[in-house]
């Protein structure tokens, strides 16, 4: 029998994730699918949280193609492309957003995280502001994908018909608007807000503490 590799474990775990969802993805089921005993699996995966971290890292490494800024793009362009790429990666597999929540950058991702911070700091943001901007983009993207991947969509026409006029119109707009379109609107608004804050910061006179 060929020796089990980490790639084999990750590949089978992603298959289980797509078929069973995050709740159904357990180390017991994974071991059964790999036709091995659980103690053998522990050589690669100690527990479910470790497995989730591994899967999240593997998904981003393969599908999140714009995690680092390009030398020729503005910080605004980077934030937009980064968020769109992140969203696309989260949507590749079932429960992708839930899988990613609670994870932190790992050593292989440190260089990219540093480049992201540097891109914003070079534009005039402080390290604290750069961190909050990246967190805001990440949280917005995760929340949007969580909503998109959820199954509790409003499908009851009786509920919609009973709504007051503005809410009814909003429901109708939501029904004919793609999640991607709504995401673009929110992302554009966030970046516009960051730009306004930076402009205000650059044009605010520095008070002389000696006066």
Curated annotation (Swiss-Prot):
Pfam families: TetR_C_1, TetR_N
Top-level taxonomic group: Bacteria
Annotated DNA-binding residue span(s): 26-45
UniProt-annotated binding residues for tetracycline: 64, 82
Biological processes, Gene Ontology terms: negative regulation of DNA-templated transcription; response to antibiotic
Signal peptide start and end residues: none
Residue intervals of the HTH tetR-type domain: 3-63
SUPFAM superfamilies the record matches: Homeodomain-like (SSF46689), Tetracyclin repressor-like, C-terminal domain (SSF48498)
Keywords per UniProt: Antibiotic resistance, DNA-binding, Magnesium, Metal-binding, Plasmid, Repressor, Transcription, Transcription regulation
Keyword Ligase carried by entry: no
Annotated positions binding Mg(2+): 100
Molecular function terms, GO-annotated: DNA binding; metal ion binding
Function: TetR is the repressor of the tetracycline resistance element; its N-terminal region forms a helix-turn-helix structure and binds DNA. Binding of tetracycline to TetR reduces the repressor affinity for the tetracycline resistance gene (tetA) promoter operator sites.
Name of the protein this chain belongs to: Tetracycline repressor protein class E
Species lineage: Bacteria, Pseudomonadati, Pseudomonadota, Gammaproteobacteria, Enterobacterales
């Amino acid at each position: 029998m060929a020796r089990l590799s980490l790639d084999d474990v990750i590949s089978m775990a992603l298959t289980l994730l797509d078929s069973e969802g995050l709740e159904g993805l357990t180390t017991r089921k994974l071991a059964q699918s790999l036709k091995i005993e659980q103690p053998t699996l522990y050589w690669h995966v100690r527990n479910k949280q470790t497995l989730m971290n591994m899967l999240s890292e593997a998904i981003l490494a393969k599908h999140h193609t714009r995690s680092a800024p390009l030398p020729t793009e503005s910080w605004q362009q980077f934030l937009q492309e980064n968020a769109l790429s992140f969203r696309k990666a989260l949507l590749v597999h079932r429960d992708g957003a839930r899988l990613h929540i609670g994870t932190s950058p790992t050593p292989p991702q440190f260089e990219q995280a540093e480049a992201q911070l540097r891109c914003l700091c070079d534009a005039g943001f402080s390290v604290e502001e750069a961190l909050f901007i990246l967190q805001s983009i990440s949280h917005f993207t995760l929340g949007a994908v969580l909503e998109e991947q959820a199954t509790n969509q409003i499908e009851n026409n009786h509920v919609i018909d009973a709504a007051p006029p503005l809410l009814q119109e909003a429901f109708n707009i939501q029904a004919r608007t793609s999640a991607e379109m709504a995401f673009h609107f929110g992302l554009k608004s966030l970046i516009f807000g960051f730009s306004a804050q930076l402009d205000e910061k650059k044009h605010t006179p520095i008070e002389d503490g000696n006066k």
